[in-house]
A protein has these predicted regions:
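Extracytoplasmic/periplasmic substrate-binding proteins
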Residues: 1, 6-10, 115, 152-221
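Stable alpha-helical elements in mature extracytoplasmic
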Residues: 4-7, 16, 20, 67, ...
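Hinge/lid segment of periplasmic solute-binding proteins
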Residues: 5-62, 88, 213
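Short, solvent-exposed loop/beta-turn-alpha elements that line the ligand-binding surface or hinge
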Residues: 21-37, 80, 122-153, 202-203, ...
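Extracytoplasmic/periplasmic solute-binding protein
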Residues: 44-57, 62, 88-140, 187
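A conserved catalytic-core signature of glycosyltransferases
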Residues: 59-61, 66, 177
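Aromatic-glycine-rich donor-binding/catalytic loop that engages nucleotide-sugar donors
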Residues: 69-80, 163-164
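Glycine-centered hinge/linker elements that transmit conformational signals in sensory
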Residues: 89-93, 133-171
Length: 221
């Protein structure tokens, strides 16, 4: 399966698919490559009894694509963009320096929100963010100081970027909304997933070097 948990659930007990667990049990040599996969991903592809119902192919990993030529011209080292605060500083320099119209493009999706927290080993909700058999029952924003401070800092940066017109939001139609802006030079960076790589390279068409930064953290921690 490739997709979110709810997509897997639609097929897990249908007559169209055979549960993968039987094949796993028959494999006497084990599945070492799966054992090294992030445990939360594995859990998301199991039923409530812990039996695996699918293999998570095509899983998305987030990062920030950037116009390497533009950042170099602005004197910005992409390796130093490690947090939301660093991203804000880079956007200020890019926009106020006249290098581009928008510093970064954002997709306001919880996936990126949780990924930024995950860079610091934090989760916004209890019970492993609901990835196991136990459902989420509590938001940790008001219960855990580290979670509160990380979320507050991240949302504060979001707010400043929008208020100061340093960023542009995009939705699910990223190929029409943000990739053309980056290809034209109107946007220096955008937050996306690795599956977007070919599309941005095709859009840039060699006009500039495209780079990608691993997902940044919510704070400087």
């Amino acid at each position: 399966f490739s997709g979110p948990v709810e997509n897997v659930a639609m097929y897990a007990n249908s007559e169209y698919c055979t549960p993968l667990q039987g094949f796993i049990d028959a494999d006497s040599q084990g599945w070492p490559e799966l054992e090294s996969t992030w445990e939360a991903i594995r859990t998301a592809y199991c039923d409530n009894e812990g039996n695996q119902v699918g293999y998570p192919v095509g899983y998305s990993y987030p990062g920030i694509y950037y116009n390497a030529d533009m950042l170099a011209e602005a004197g910005i080292d992409p390796k130093e963009i490690k947090s939301f605060n660093d991203l804000y500083d880079a956007c200020v320099k890019l926009v106020e320096g006249g290098y581009t119209t928008y510093g970064v493009g954002f997709h306001p999706d919880g996936f990126y929100f949780n990924a930024a927290l995950g860079r610091e080993g934090l989760q916004a909700y209890n019970n492993n963010n609901g990835l196991g058999s136990e459902r989420i029952t509590e938001c940790l924003y008001t219960k855990d100081t580290k979670v509160h401070d990380a979320i507050y800092n991240m949302l504060d940066v979001y707010q400043k970027l929008h208020a100061e017109k340093l960023c542009v939001a995009y939705g699910s139609d990223y190929q029409a909304e943000v990739i053309p802006q980056m290809a034209s030079g109107d946007c220096a960076m955008f937050m996306g997933v690795v599956s977007m790589t070919t599309k941005i390279l095709d859009a840039a068409n060699g006009a500039f070097e495209v780079g990608i930064i691993p997902m940044i953290s919510a704070t400087e921690a």
